């Protein structure tokens, strides 16, 4: 836990994990794991540095760069780089903390970390972004490596930025190695990587539908937030599987379907083009079957929905919006974004699950539901280490297996450690938290990172 009063995002992530551990039988059966939680909540290393670069007018600009190397008990630090003006140590510690247990749920050998800078790529020229990425990597390259720390993309860091950073690393270190994931296919990247988080989210929720007896996606109405990679590819996969996508959004507002047909593949392709040009959805020329709601999130405007998938950013579903989704008939909520729901919203969903039993909403946390992205990053690392490339079908099949295992790992762990009434769906948030934590805690114990009294 933080020793500072100014890390609200990290405190929220810690409290969410600690609450589920405390309200299970884990600490009763294994009281020594309290020590593990105390140790695991402090990063192994925090790297903070200045990034000095030159804008197109020849002016000196400076930003704050970070890398939080949180836990390496299961493998090299693994987690994205975020470029956004909101980036600070609290946000990166929250993301890195979540990443530890998310990576554990994939079953792959990856530790947890996160990094980035308070640089805003919006409105910057290609040359400015290149100069920033090179300046950022001039320091970061000293602290990363294929067997040490393997960053990836995140908000503000796509294929272009990964390319600039990889080139800067290669020149500075004089090595060509799998030090970053999300690379171009011709220089070490993996097929399915851009689609992985969205596809994996849909595969995960498919197991929720099947286990609960709700059937397939056919005919289900799905509300999505966000309009980046996660939302785009989740929407395309949902449509492929027969669902109706009723919303997308960005920081400027929400795009909501007005009729029964929903958002089409053509609409999503148009959104992709807009986002590729780094523009807002306000520039989307929507037809009569869609409406634009300025400054709004979609949850209270979508009408009847069966499934809600927050895919934009943290804390994007409030208590009031959670209650609104329940009133709209929503039965499944899964986070495509990290910590997409506030603690109060999660409480609404979990209380409903306990009270309504088989008729309740079923909530899945981001560390399980959106682990597909980092899973395929891990598969990219495996391909890099073997100097080979798998086919799209091979990667997709491995992704499906990872999401299936993440679902059943959380489900079965909840059955062991969380008491449930007859007919009550298991708590996926508790089960996923416990499963990820126990795996990491045991590895830390075996390696001497913590110990119990004899």
Curated annotation (Swiss-Prot):
The active site is at residue 114. The keyword Nucleotidyltransferase does not apply. One of its GO terms (molecular function) is glutamate dehydrogenase (NADP+) activity. The modification N-acetylserine is found at residue 2. InterPro entries: Aminoacid_DH-like_N_sf, Glu/Leu/Phe/Val/Trp_DH, Glu/Leu/Phe/Val/Trp_DH_C, Glu/Leu/Phe/Val/Trp_DH_dimer, Glu/Leu/Phe/Val_DH_AS, Glu_DH, Glu_Leu_Phe_Val_DH, NAD(P)-bd_dom_sf. GO terms for cellular component: cytosol. The keyword Acetylation applies. Its EC number is 1.4.1.4. PROSITE patterns: GLFV_DEHYDROGENASE. Keywords: Acetylation, NADP, Oxidoreductase. It catalyses: L-glutamate + NADP(+) + H2O = 2-oxoglutarate + NH4(+) + NADPH + H(+). Homohexamer. Belongs to the Glu/Leu/Phe/Val dehydrogenases family. This is NADP-specific glutamate dehydrogenase.
């Amino acid at each position: 836990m933080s020793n500072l009063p100014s890390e609200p995002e990290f405190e929220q992530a810690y409290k969410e994990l600690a609450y589920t551990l405390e309200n299970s039988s884990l600490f009763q059966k294994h009281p020594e794991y309290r020590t593990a939680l105390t140790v695991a909540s402090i990063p192994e290393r925090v790297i903070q540095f200045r990034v000095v670069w030159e804008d197109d007018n020849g002016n000196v600009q400076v930003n704050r760069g970070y890398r939080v190397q949180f836990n390496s008990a299961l493998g090299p630090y693994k987690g994205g780089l975020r470029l956004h003006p909101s980036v600070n140590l609290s946000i990166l510690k929250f993301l890195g903390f979540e990443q530890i247990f998310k990576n554990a749920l994939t079953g792959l050998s990856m530790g947890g970390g996160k990094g980035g800078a308070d640089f805003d790529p919006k409105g910057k020229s290609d040359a400015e972004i290149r100069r920033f990425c090179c300046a950022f990597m001039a320091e970061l390259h000293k602290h990363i490596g294929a067997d040490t720390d393997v960053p990836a993309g995140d908000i503000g860091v796509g294929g272009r930025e990964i390319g600039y950073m990889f080139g800067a690393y290669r020149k500075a270190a004089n090595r060509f190695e799998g030090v970053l994931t999300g690379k171009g296919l011709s220089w070490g990247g993996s097929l399915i990587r851009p689609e992985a988080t969205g596809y994996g989210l849909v595969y995960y929720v498919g197991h929720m539908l099947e286990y609960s007896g709700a059937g397939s996606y056919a005919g289900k109405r799905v509300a999505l937030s966000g309009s980046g990679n996660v939302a785009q590819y989740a929407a395309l996969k949902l449509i492929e599987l027969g669902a109706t996508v009723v919303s997308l959004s960005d920081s400027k507002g929400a795009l909501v379907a007005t009729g029964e047909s929903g958002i089409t593949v053509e609409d999503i392709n148009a959104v992709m083009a807009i986002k590729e040009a780094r523009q807002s959805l306000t520039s989307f020329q929507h037809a009569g079957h869609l409406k634009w709601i300025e400054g709004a999130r979609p949850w209270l405007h979508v009408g009847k929905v069966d499934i809600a998938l927050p895919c934009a950013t943290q804390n994007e579903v409030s208590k009031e919006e959670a209650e609104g989704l329940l009133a709209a008939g929503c039965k499944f909520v899964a986070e495509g974004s990290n910590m997409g729901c506030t603690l109060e919203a999660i409480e609404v969903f979990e209380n409903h699950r306990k009270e309504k039993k088989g008729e309740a909403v079923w909530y899945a946390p981001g560390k399980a539901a959106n682990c597909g992205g980092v899973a395929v990053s891990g598969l990219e690392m495996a391909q890099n280490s073997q100097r080979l490339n798998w086919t799209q079908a091979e990667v997709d099949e491995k992704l499906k297996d990872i999401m299936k295992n993440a679902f059943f790992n959380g489900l079965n762990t909840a059955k062991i450690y969380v008491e449930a009434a007859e007919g009550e769906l298991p708590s996926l948030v508790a089960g996923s938290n416990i499963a990820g934590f126990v795996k990491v805690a045991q590895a830390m114990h075996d390696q001497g990172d913590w110990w119990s009294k004899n």
